[in-house]
Swiss-Prot record:
Subunit structure comment from the entry: Homodimer.
Reaction catalyzed: malonyl-[ACP] + acetyl-CoA + H(+) = 3-oxobutanoyl-[ACP] + CO2 + CoA
Pfam family, one: ACP_syn_III_C
Protein name, per record: Beta-ketoacyl-[acyl-carrier-protein] synthase III
Main location: cytoplasm
Record text about domains: The last Arg residue of the ACP-binding site is essential for the weak association between ACP/AcpP and FabH.
Annotated segments matching region ACP-binding: 251-255
Biological-process GO terms, alphabetical: fatty acid biosynthetic process
Active site (catalytic residues): 113, 250, 280
CDD domains: KAS_III
Source organism of this protein record: Brucella ovis (strain ATCC 25840 / 63/290 / NCTC 10512)
GO molecular function list: 3-oxoacyl-[acyl-carrier-protein] synthase activity; beta-ketoacyl-acyl-carrier-protein synthase III activity
UniProt superkingdom: Bacteria
Family: Belongs to the thiolase-like superfamily. FabH family.
Length: 323
């Protein structure tokens, strides 16, 4: 059987780092208040000339180089983002051009913070269906451009950045010891769409709008939804939490991460946390955390890695991958 194996990984962050203390002159807040409630200490903010496309292209180049490939080897460019450069054409097409790729196809996918999980799952389907051999999967965001900088409950939470992986078709044996994606589960429930949304859009207000969130409501649903979809992935493979080498969750809030790991009985030392350095980078969150753990030597070939995310909609999902 065909498996989708991770061949390369890369990331990119804006130059500017904004610390919690930098917010004290903007809104009524403090470093202590932010850290206590979120675990965030700093985040990167896109500056002039830094966009979703430029960050995504930089992460993509790094992933292709890490894979030992050339841009011309890529069949599909799949970008998960909620902050595209333009309403259309797709920012994935712009990244395709930046990389000099003139073959295959490219498109954007939008599932907010769950975007990268949705994108990996979509890429896996294209690979296993024979429509692509190598897929460049990117999560890139510039959420700082849709924040209300007078709302202290949201503006302190988010950062900008990008992460990317190259998935490649490889022959597997249908075993959980195979390298590659072993299971993926996606969910959504539009009944919760008013709990985390942007109050604008081309079809309604003809503006971009700003991010709005009912933080307590999101927190209330997050842990249960996340653990349910993870347990479904375990059931599909016969694996358990004890088999997990690394848990790479969406980096939204350390409280949610800790509560999810505890409910799943995943040891603290197996949890990859970058929310303290990156904040919530939406669709870029999981690949940025993955890239960090690969770069520092934690995640190694053969490790069983659990990925999960939850975002506006609500959307949520989980992926089990053998590195």
């Amino acid at each position: 059987m065909i498996r989708s194996v991770v061949r390369g990984i890369g990331s990119a962050l804006p130059k500017r780092v904004m610390k919690n203390t930098d917010f004290e002159g903007i809104v009524e807040t403090s470093d202590e208040w932010i850290v206590q409630r979120t675990g965030i200490r700093e985040r990167h903010i896109a500056g002039k000339g830094e966009t979703t496309v430029s960050l995504g292209a930089a992460a993509a180049r790094a992933a292709i180089e890490n894979a030992g490939l050339q841009p011309s080897d890529i069949d599909l460019v799949l970008l998960a983002t909620s902050t595209p450069n333009n309403t259309f054409p797709a920012s994935a097409v712009a990244i395709q051009r930046e990389l000099g790729i003139t073959r295959g196809f490219a498109f954007d996918l939008q599932a907010v913070c769950s975007g990268f999980i949705y994108a990996i799952t979509t890429a896996d389907l294209y690979i296993r269906g024979g429509m692509a051999r190598r897929v460049l999967v990117i999560g890139a965001e510039t959420f700082s451009r849709i924040l209300d900088w007078t709302d202290r409950t949201t503006c302190v939470l988010f950062g900008d950045g990008a992460g990317a992986i190259v998935l490649e078709a490889a022959e597997g044996h249908g075993l959980t010891s195979d390298r590659g994606i072993l299971a993926a589960n996606l969910r959504s429930d539009g009944n919760h769409k008013e709990k985390l949304y942007v109050d604008g859009g081309p079809s309604t207000t003809q503006t971009v709008g700003h991010l709005r969130m009912e933080g307590r409501e999101v927190f209330k649903h997050a842990v249960g939804m996340i653990t349910d979809v993870i347990e479904a992935s375990f059931e599909a493979t016969g694996l358990t939490a004890e088999d997990i080498d690394w848990f790479v969750p969406h980096q939204a809030n350390k409280r949610i991460i800790d509560a999810s790991a505890k409910k799943l009985h995943i040891a603290e030392e197996k949890v990859v946390i970058t929310v303290d350095r990156h904040g919530n980078t939406s669709a870029a969150s999981v690949p940025l955390a993955l890239a960090t753990a690969v770069a520092d030597g934690r995640i190694k070939k053969g490790d069983l890695v659990l990925l999960e995310a939850m975002g506006g909609g609500f959307t949520w999902g989980a992926v089990l991958v053998r590195w």
